[in-house]
């Protein structure tokens, strides 16, 4: 690969194959390649802070050395390549001066725009709401909350709003809940809360990613509550991203849940096959990778709905073809992507299946465990049975007890009902729901795997 940006992409793509998704997102995706300091036998990276610098060096330093030494990435051609990770230089902001929003706009990713967001039936409503919000001088809805599974484009749409607002010279703050917490604790410890409040309460657009992680942190929830109130009172636009609807964020204060629902809430659905193929083609273009049509169709059909995983599959095929000096064809794609097609939902617990179904249908787990005539609850109970039959060894008796069913024969009827709907393929909602539940199960199981591996 020619550019420094592509060298970084190639290194991270190879690293992503070696760790769980949650490890990659929390750690390795945070590092940046430093081409100016790097040489043929040593690679320098930046990490956002000292904690990440220490953690990544300890846990993944050897992995990065192995990748660079074995794959001869970019300019690193030595037999053994050393790796150094340093804390990235930070922009200093004077606590007494006005906040320089141009200096902190780097939190908005320039590459995520409305122009390169692939629109389909799964996300059209979200796209239209986001454009209206970004283009309006006063908030048309406030707050706006978009929710849905991982990798469906929520962060892209949040950054697109930020980029459009910056073009209009608006003051924009885009932050994750985790970074909001880190910043809050830092200013609290340094007794500089006036600077913290000036930064977050005096912007035109406050964009918060992973809002669900506010839960269970009383001091942070208290500060966010007052930040939200002041922004809302001053007609400043608030946009929130979450992996679930407000009522399903367990442990979040009721007063925050109610405020999240003041404006408009919209769900990002998993993409259908046509939209997935459009996404694959766009990602190929953005990464300057040429794939045969049949390979792009294969990726769309066999890789999960997670957009990041689709892009990872594209890069993985390209990297492996380069390393093996082989042409890209369908056989190569099948071989390279074999591990990505494994169904991580296998071996799910009943509790995870219940949680995945509940989140997908905006219900509480406790609601599903009790028999009800409400259509959405009845459907949820059938889906729990269906996925339990697919992914767990639990016998009929255990399933019946889990769902408080006295008639064990109901289990077979419930399973057959869902199976028939899916086989007939007449109900796009059910088909989409199946994929969403599978994605959520994959996420839950990946988190469990990452937790166990860290013990």
Swiss-Prot record:
<keyword id="KW-0238">DNA-binding</keyword>
<dbReference type="Pfam" id="PF08299">
    <property type="entry name" value="Bac_DnaA_C"/>
</dbReference>
<dbReference type="GO" id="GO:0006270">
    <property type="term" value="P:DNA replication initiation"/>
</dbReference>
<feature type="region of interest" description="Domain III, AAA+ region">
    <location>
        <begin position="107"/>
        <end position="321"/>
    </location>
</feature>
<feature type="region of interest" description="Domain IV, binds dsDNA">
    <location>
        <begin position="322"/>
        <end position="455"/>
    </location>
</feature>
<dbReference type="InterPro" id="IPR010921">
    <property type="entry name" value="Trp_repressor/repl_initiator"/>
</dbReference>
<keyword id="KW-0963">Cytoplasm</keyword>
<keyword id="KW-0235">DNA replication</keyword>
<dbReference type="GO" id="GO:0005886">
    <property type="term" value="C:plasma membrane"/>
</dbReference>
<dbReference type="InterPro" id="IPR013317">
    <property type="entry name" value="DnaA_dom"/>
</dbReference>
<feature type="region of interest" description="Domain I, interacts with DnaA modulators">
    <location>
        <begin position="1"/>
        <end position="75"/>
    </location>
</feature>
<dbReference type="InterPro" id="IPR003593">
    <property type="entry name" value="AAA+_ATPase"/>
</dbReference>
<dbReference type="GO" id="GO:0003688">
    <property type="term" value="F:DNA replication origin binding"/>
</dbReference>
<dbReference type="InterPro" id="IPR038454">
    <property type="entry name" value="DnaA_N_sf"/>
</dbReference>
<comment type="similarity">
    <text>Belongs to the DnaA family.</text>
</comment>
<dbReference type="InterPro" id="IPR027417">
    <property type="entry name" value="P-loop_NTPase"/>
</dbReference>
<feature type="binding site">
    <location>
        <position position="153"/>
    </location>
    <ligand>
        <name>ATP</name>
    </ligand>
</feature>
<comment type="subunit">
    <text>Oligomerizes as a right-handed, spiral filament on DNA at oriC.</text>
</comment>
<dbReference type="GO" id="GO:0005524">
    <property type="term" value="F:ATP binding"/>
</dbReference>
<protein>
    <recommendedName>
        <fullName>Chromosomal replication initiator protein DnaA</fullName>
    </recommendedName>
</protein>
<dbReference type="InterPro" id="IPR020591">
    <property type="entry name" value="Chromosome_initiator_DnaA-like"/>
</dbReference>
<dbReference type="InterPro" id="IPR018312">
    <property type="entry name" value="Chromosome_initiator_DnaA_CS"/>
</dbReference>
<feature type="binding site">
    <location>
        <position position="154"/>
    </location>
    <ligand>
        <name>ATP</name>
    </ligand>
</feature>
<keyword id="KW-0547">Nucleotide-binding</keyword>
<dbReference type="GO" id="GO:0008289">
    <property type="term" value="F:lipid binding"/>
</dbReference>
<feature type="region of interest" description="Domain II">
    <location>
        <begin position="75"/>
        <end position="106"/>
    </location>
</feature>
<keyword id="KW-0067">ATP-binding</keyword>
<comment type="function">
    <text>Plays an essential role in the initiation and regulation of chromosomal replication. ATP-DnaA binds to the origin of replication (oriC) to initiate formation of the DNA replication initiation complex once per cell cycle. Binds the DnaA box (a 9 base pair repeat at the origin) and separates the double-stranded (ds)DNA. Forms a right-handed helical filament on oriC DNA; dsDNA binds to the exterior of the filament while single-stranded (ss)DNA is stabiized in the filament's interior.</text>
</comment>
<dbReference type="InterPro" id="IPR013159">
    <property type="entry name" value="DnaA_C"/>
</dbReference>
<dbReference type="GO" id="GO:0005737">
    <property type="term" value="C:cytoplasm"/>
</dbReference>
<feature type="binding site">
    <location>
        <position position="155"/>
    </location>
    <ligand>
        <name>ATP</name>
    </ligand>
</feature>
<dbReference type="InterPro" id="IPR001957">
    <property type="entry name" value="Chromosome_initiator_DnaA"/>
</dbReference>
<feature type="binding site">
    <location>
        <position position="151"/>
    </location>
    <ligand>
        <name>ATP</name>
    </ligand>
</feature>
<dbReference type="GO" id="GO:0016887">
    <property type="term" value="F:ATP hydrolysis activity"/>
</dbReference>
<keyword id="KW-0446">Lipid-binding</keyword>
<dbReference type="GO" id="GO:0006275">
    <property type="term" value="P:regulation of DNA replication"/>
</dbReference>
<dbReference type="Pfam" id="PF00308">
    <property type="entry name" value="Bac_DnaA"/>
</dbReference>
């Amino acid at each position: 690969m020619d550019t420094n940006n592509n060298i970084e992409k190639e290194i991270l793509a190879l690293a992503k194959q070696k760790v769980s998704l949650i490890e990659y997102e929390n750690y390795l995706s945070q590092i940046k390649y430093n081409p100016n300091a790097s040489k043929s036998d040593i690679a320098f990276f930046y990490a956002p802070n000292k904690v990440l610098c220490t953690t990544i060096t300890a846990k993944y330093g050897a992995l990065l050395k192995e990748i660079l030494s074995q794959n001869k990435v970019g300019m690193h051609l030595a037999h053994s390549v050393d790796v150094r990770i340093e804390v990235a230089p930070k922009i200093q902001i004077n606590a007494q001066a006005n906040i320089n929003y141009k200096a902190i706009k780097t939190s908005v990713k320039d590459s995520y725009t409305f122009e390169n967001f692939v629109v389909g039936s799964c996300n059209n409503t979200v796209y239209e709401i986001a454009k209206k919000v970004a283009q309006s001088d006063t908030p048309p809805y406030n707050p706006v909350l978009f929710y849905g599974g991982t990798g469906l484009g929520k962060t892209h749409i949040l950054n697109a709003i930020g980029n459009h607002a910056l073009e209009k010279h608006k003051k924009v703050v885009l932050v994750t809940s985790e970074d909001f917490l880190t910043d809050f604790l830092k200013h609290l410890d340094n007794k500089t809360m006036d600077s913290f409040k000036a930064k977050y309460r005096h912007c035109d657009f406050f964009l918060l990613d992973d809002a669900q992680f506010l839960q269970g942190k009383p001091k942070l929830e208290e500060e966010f509550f007052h930040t939200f109130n002041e922004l809302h009172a001053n007609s400043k636009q608030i946009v929130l991203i979450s992996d679930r609807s407000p009522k399903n964020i367990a442990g979040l204060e009721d007063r925050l849940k109610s405020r999240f629902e003041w404006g408009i809430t919209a769900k990002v659905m998993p993409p259908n096959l046509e939209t997935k193929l459009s996404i694959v083609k766009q990602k190929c273009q953005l990464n300057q990778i040429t794939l045969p049509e049949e390979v792009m169709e294969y990726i769309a059909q066999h890789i999960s709905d997670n957009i990041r995983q689709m892009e990872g599959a594209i890069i993985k095929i390209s990297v492996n073809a380069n390393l093996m000096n082989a042409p890209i064809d369908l056989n190569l794609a099948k071989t390279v992507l074999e591990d990505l097609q494994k169904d991580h939902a296998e071996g799910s617990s009943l509790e995870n299946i219940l949680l995945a179904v509940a989140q997908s249908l905006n219900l509480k787990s406790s609601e599903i465990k009790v028999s009800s005539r409400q259509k959405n609850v009845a459907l949820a109970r059938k889906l729990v049975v269906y996925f339990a039959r697919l992914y767990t060894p639990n016998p009929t008796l255990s399933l019946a007890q889990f769902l408080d069913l006295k008639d064990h024969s109901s289990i077979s009827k419930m399973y057959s009902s869902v199976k028939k709907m899916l086989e007939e393929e007449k109900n796009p909602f059910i088909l989409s729901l199946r994929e969403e539940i599978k994605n959520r199960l994959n996420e839950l199981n990946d988190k469990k795997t990452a937790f166990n591996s860290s013990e």
